[in-house]
């Protein structure tokens, strides 16, 4: 492929990564779901909103899935409803995002039923996952192992703060609130450092809890039945509780 001056990659995407996305015709198939995956929208440059606001110094959580129209925005708006009052910024992105698409209607409806703000759900627009988002995030929560792998490949230094949402819940189940708070206290007063320290404390449980990799993924409901959306939400929702508990332990003194 010959790249013209108009083919410059958008902000936050390396030329190598942009070339890979332009050459790619279909996204990887999720191991958790045999349904058709969303088709990537690589030919058009991603909007400027793909770059995080680096001037925003709030503790930051990033959620990641494939198309950024079902699972990761549902996790985003549910976490935002609970954690924004604590000064936490929550946003989401997709490894093969359907850029500028809204959340699917069932995802919006279920998210609101579970406590998300209606405006936040309807206002979502899908974005590509790019390196600056991962660098800026204090905690990265993916919806499946394939997204965790993709994120760590883009930003290897994010390994110890990147989990699937269900993996985080499984690991956090063996970490007491007091232990999470103690880890945060050891990091000092900066909220972002405190959240990263709590995430590291969860990481350290990886050798202490039974591995259950097949249960670490959340099924992709895209183009599937309402029942599949509800199953996906039922796999996602318990992890929201665990994230909230750990974040509160880290930030509330």
Residues covered by each model-derived region:
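Conserved active-site segments centered on acidic
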Residues: 2-137, 146-153, 157-160, 248-250
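Phosphate-binding/catalytic loops
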Residues: 2-34, 38-40, 47, 53, ...
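Short secondary-structure boundary segments
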Residues: 144-145, 166
């Amino acid at each position: 492929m010959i790249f013209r001056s108009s083919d410059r990659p958008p902000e936050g995407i390396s030329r190598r990564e942009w070339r890979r996305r332009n050459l790619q015709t279909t996204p990887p198939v999720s191991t958790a779901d045999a349904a058709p995956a969303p088709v990537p929208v690589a030919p058009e440059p991603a909007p400027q909103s793909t770059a995080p606001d680096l001037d925003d110094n709030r503790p930051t959580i990033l959620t990641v899935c494939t198309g950024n129209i079902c699972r990761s925005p549902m996790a985003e708006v549910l976490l935002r409803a609970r954690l924004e009052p604590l000064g936490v910024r929550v946003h989401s992105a997709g490894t093969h995002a359907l850029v500028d698409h809204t959340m699917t209607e069932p995802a919006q409806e279920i998210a609101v039923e579970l406590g998300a703000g209606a405006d936040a759900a309807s206002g979502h627009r899908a974005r590509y996952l790019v390196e600056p988002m991962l660098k800026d995030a204090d905690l990265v929560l993916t919806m499946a192992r394939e997204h965790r792998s993709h994120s760590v490949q883009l930003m290897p230094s994010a390994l110890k703060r990147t989990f699937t949402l269900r993996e985080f819940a499984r690991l956090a189940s063996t970490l007491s609130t007091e232990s999470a708070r103690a880890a945060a206290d050891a990091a000092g007063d900066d909220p972002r450092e405190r959240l990263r320290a709590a995430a590291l404390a969860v990481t350290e449980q990886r050798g202490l809890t039974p591995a259950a990799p097949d249960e670490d993924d959340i099924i992709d409901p895209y183009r599937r039945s309402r029942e599949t959306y509800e199953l996906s939400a039922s796999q996602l929702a318990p992890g929201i509780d665990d994230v909230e508990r750990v974040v509160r332990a880290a930030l509330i003194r």
